[in-house]
């Protein structure tokens, strides 16, 4: 049969490529637990080995950029948990695993459980930022959940002693490793929330293996942290260790020491802020008293301008000016009349009409008396008006009040004394009476 009749004829290379694509797409990434054998580590840095169980085996490759993250000794006979992709080595047509990560079998199981729980809780929203509680700006009392014999507590207290030695600390002791640790941590969280005596809680432990830290990857602990009414700061292991508790907590600190630094204030900052507040208060008080002094001067000036004595003086000056004006008018009128009389006498003497002279004299005398009486009435009217105004002003004058036997008492600062509650023993007082001032000191206070 001619080759042209085989439209789908493949080469070996094409076949291997198709098989590789099928393996990678249909199977993809897997988790596998097996024993290492035939382990080799050539100069290229890549690892080549076989994973086997009691009956079968599969070839594996782990490239250098992945195996450089492995920090345990890999050797034949070691049980491991690997994450790998199924593929095909085309030159030989052999299927193989491309290993991406590897852990000893014990830790591998824990890691697998960690990933499963992480995926579950993430789907429920326990890691969501919207549920994170904000930390208080100022911590008045700090709670710490940890082992009382662990290094984590020592590190936290050391930082507090340096930064804020006056901060009260409540320790909720618990196991942080082992079978009973999760239940004790949950109980400690419950006690802290029930007492509600702290502003926030640090959940802390020193570094360790994945198995050592497994209690912080427990679902019960994660849900207790999520349900806490108090903000929780996690400080578990080293910076590279990330636990489920870290993901659920309201804030993750890389170490217990870092957690203590994050939630406390440096006493040097506190002293600096207090100094700044004191300076601002002093400036505010200076400004306030300056305004009070300005207002006092202004009010004193207004009182002086409105004092009844000044009004009396103004009225008096008006009467004096009026009197002078009236005297000038009268003198001018009299001068005119005298001049007129002299002129008339001259005419009379020249003509000698005795009867007419007598009539003119009589008319002049009558007009003089009328003018004089009018002037006296006018002066009397203004004198009476002045007396009325003076009487009214005297009625409202503080001096008149003093004349009736009353007095006015004020502090040495000038402020008026109105109530007995203003006075304290030892205060110096100034009392205004009719005719002068009395300066006194308070020796005894009696209330009605």
Swiss-Prot record:
The protein's enzyme class: hydrolase
Enzyme Commission number, as recorded: 3.1.11.6
GO biological process, one term: DNA catabolic process
MF term (GO), any: nucleic acid binding
Pfam families per record: Exonuc_VII_L (PF02601), tRNA_anti_2 (PF13742)
One GO cellular component, as annotated: cytoplasm
Keywords: Cytoplasm, Exonuclease, Hydrolase, Nuclease
Keyword Protein transport annotated: no
Top-level taxon in the UniProt lineage: Bacteria
Record's catalysed reaction(s): Exonucleolytic cleavage in either 5'- to 3'- or 3'- to 5'-direction to yield nucleoside 5'-phosphates
PANTHER family, alphabetized: EXODEOXYRIBONUCLEASE 7 LARGE SUBUNIT
Physiological role: Bidirectionally degrades single-stranded DNA into large acid-insoluble oligonucleotides, which are then degraded further into small acid-soluble oligonucleotides.
Assembly behavior: Heterooligomer composed of large and small subunits.
Entry protein name: Exodeoxyribonuclease 7 large subunit
Lineage: Bacteria, Pseudomonadati, Pseudomonadota, Gammaproteobacteria, Enterobacterales
């Amino acid at each position: 049969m001619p080759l042209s009749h085989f439209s789908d004829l493949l080469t070996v290379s094409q076949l291997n490529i198709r098989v590789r694509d099928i393996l990678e797409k249909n199977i993809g990434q897997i988790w596998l637990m097996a024993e290492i054998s035939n382990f080799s580590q050539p100069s290229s840095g890549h690892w080549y080995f076989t994973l086997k169980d009691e009956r079968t085996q599969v070839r594996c490759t782990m490239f250098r950029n992945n195996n450089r993250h492995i920090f345990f000794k890999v050797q034949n006979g070691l049980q491991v948990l690997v994450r790998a992709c199924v593929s095909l080595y085309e030159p030989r047509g052999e299927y193989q695993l491309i290993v991406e990560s590897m852990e000893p079998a014990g830790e591998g199981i824990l890691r697998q459980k960690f990933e499963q729980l992480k995926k579950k809780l993430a789907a429920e929203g326990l890691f969501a930022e919207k549920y994170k509680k904000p930390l208080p700006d100022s911590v008045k009392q700090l709670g710490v959940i940890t082992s009382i014999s662990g290094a984590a507590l020592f590190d936290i207290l050391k930082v507090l002693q340096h930064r804020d030695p006056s901060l009260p600390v409540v320790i909720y002791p618990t196991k942080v490793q082992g079978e009973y640790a999760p239940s004790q941590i949950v109980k400690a969280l419950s006690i802290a929330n029930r007492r509600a005596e702290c502003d926030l809680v640090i959940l802390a432990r020193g570094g360790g293996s994945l198995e050592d830290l497994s209690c912080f990857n427990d679902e019960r602990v994660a849900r207790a942290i999520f349900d806490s009414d108090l903000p929780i700061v996690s400080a578990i292991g080293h910076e590279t260790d990330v636990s489920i508790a870290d993901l659920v907590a309201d804030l993750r600190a890389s170490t217990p020491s870092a957690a203590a630094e994050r939630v406390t204030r440096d006493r040097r900052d506190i002293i600096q802020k207090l100094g700044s507040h004191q300076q601002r208060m002093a400036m505010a008080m200076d400004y306030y008293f300056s305004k009070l002094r300005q207002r006092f001067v202004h009010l004193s000036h207004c009182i002086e301008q409105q004092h009844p004595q000044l009004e009396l003086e103004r009225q008096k000056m008006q009467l004096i000016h009026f009197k002078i004006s009236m005297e000038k008018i009268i003198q001018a009128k009299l001068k005119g009349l005298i001049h007129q009389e002299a002129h008339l006498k001259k005419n009379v003497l020249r003509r000698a009409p005795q009867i007419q002279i007598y009539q003119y004299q009589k008319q002049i005398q009558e007009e003089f008396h009328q003018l004089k009486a009018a002037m006296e009435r006018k002066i009397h009217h203004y004198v009476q008006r002045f007396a009325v105004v003076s009487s009214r002003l005297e009625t409202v004058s503080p001096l008149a009040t003093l004349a009736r036997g009353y007095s006015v008492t004020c502090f040495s600062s000038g402020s008026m004394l109105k109530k007995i509650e203003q006075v304290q023993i030892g205060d110096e007082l100034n009392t205004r009476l009719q005719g002068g001032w009395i300066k006194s000191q308070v020796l005894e206070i009696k209330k009605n």
